[in-house]
């Protein structure tokens, strides 16, 4: 009986040692995976350390076009802010969920380039999700950002369809009333969006139409103008289209009509509309996207009487 008890005790010790050893192995793997947590960028070599679906989602997110600067800003701050620090990871524990899934609990502190740390209060807790695929442990999620990415991509695609419908309307219905150029490239600065249903929406914005001729590598402005107001969009088959456009008036009635059309969004609109620097920054960003999407050999644009602006 004593011998049996001794054997059982020994087996328990061996099992415990194996469990501890496995935990230590997983901690080491988690520490290695921490090197590939996205921080302001997604490293190409991260592909080998992430599950296919997680890498594909992040790759899609990091390559989504930005209509305005920092549209996807939250992506850049997975573990650090914008203060020039470096994320220093510490794996506290690893919890096995089943034979092929585990969660590593991390503490992340911010370290300066001289290897000193910021205030201890800046230390944050994070979760690194691990999945064993073909015998190799990979990162499958980080702080549930996988679902964040799925939601964000769905929203982006919906907004992209809305933007395309508005751009088409401005180019075809509004742009045709101006002196024509080789290309019409609208500028959209969206103030607010209200979805009336899954198939209908109202979008308030500061909209601009610009017609250009491509001379050498320069898009030279031929004509253009502002058309602020509210666009009414509805599904037409598989696509969205503008069914109505309520514009602000020109001249003396401009302010009154803008207040009526924009309502509670007026202050945001006015702040946007009156800031030429913001408008030009958005214009440049959207011009770059158009040039890339349409394979134009343009590197700058030029309004009449002004110097060319490099893109």
For each feature predicted by the language model, list its residue ranges.
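Positively charged n-region of N-terminal signal peptides that target proteins for export
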Residues: 1-4
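Short, well-ordered alpha-helical segments enriched in acidic and aromatic residues
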Residues: 41-69
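Hydrophobic/aromatic beta-strand elements that line small-molecule binding cavities or substrate pockets
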Residues: 91-93, 125-132, 186-194, 228-233
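Surface-exposed, charged secondary-structure patches
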Residues: 60-118, 187-218
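C-terminal motif of bacterial Sec signal peptides marking the signal peptidase cleavage site
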Residues: 15-17
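Short, aromatic-enriched amphipathic alpha-helices that serve as compact interaction elements
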Residues: 22-49, 158-174
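N-terminal "first-domain core" detector
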Residues: 155-193
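Low-complexity, intrinsically disordered terminal/linker segments enriched in charged
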Residues: 38, 99-134, 138-160, 243-311
């Amino acid at each position: 009986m004593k011998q049996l008890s001794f054997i059982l005790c020994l087996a328990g010790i061996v099992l415990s040692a194996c469990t501890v050893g496995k935990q230590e192995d997983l901690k080491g793997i988690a520490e290695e995976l921490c090197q590939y947590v996205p921080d302001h960028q997604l490293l190409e070599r991260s592909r080998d350390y992430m599950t296919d679906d997680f890498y594909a989602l992040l790759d899609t997110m990091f390559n989504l076009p930005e209509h305005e600067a920092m549209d996807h800003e939250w992506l850049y701050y997975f573990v650090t802010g914008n203060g020039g620090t470096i994320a220093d990871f510490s794996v506290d524990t690893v919890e096995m969920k089943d034979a092929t899934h585990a969660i590593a609990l991390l503490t992340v502190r911010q370290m300066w380039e001289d290897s000193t740390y910021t205030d201890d209060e800046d230390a944050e807790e994070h979760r690194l999700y691990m999945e064993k695929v073909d015998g190799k442990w990979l990162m499958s999620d980080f702080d549930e950002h996988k679902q964040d990415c799925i939601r964000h991509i769905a929203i982006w695609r919906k907004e992209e369809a809305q933007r395309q419908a508005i751009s088409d309307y401005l180019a075809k219905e509004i742009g045709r009333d101006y002196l024509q150029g080789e290309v019409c490239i609208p500028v959209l600065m969206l103030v607010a969006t209200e979805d009336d249903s899954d198939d209908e929406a109202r979008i308030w914005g500061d909209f601009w139409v610009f017609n250009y001729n491509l001379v050498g590598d320069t898009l030279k402005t031929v004509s253009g103008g502002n058309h602020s107001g509210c666009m009414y969009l509805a599904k037409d088959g598989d696509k969205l289209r503008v069914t109505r456009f309520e514009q602000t008036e020109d001249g003396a009635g401009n302010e009154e009509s803008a207040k009526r059309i924009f309502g509670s969004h007026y202050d945001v609109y006015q702040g946007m509309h009156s800031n030429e620097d913001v408008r030009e920054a958005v214009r440049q960003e959207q011009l770059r996207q158009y040039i890339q999407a349409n394979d134009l050999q343009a590197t700058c644009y030029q309004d009449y009487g002004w110097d060319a602006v490099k893109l």
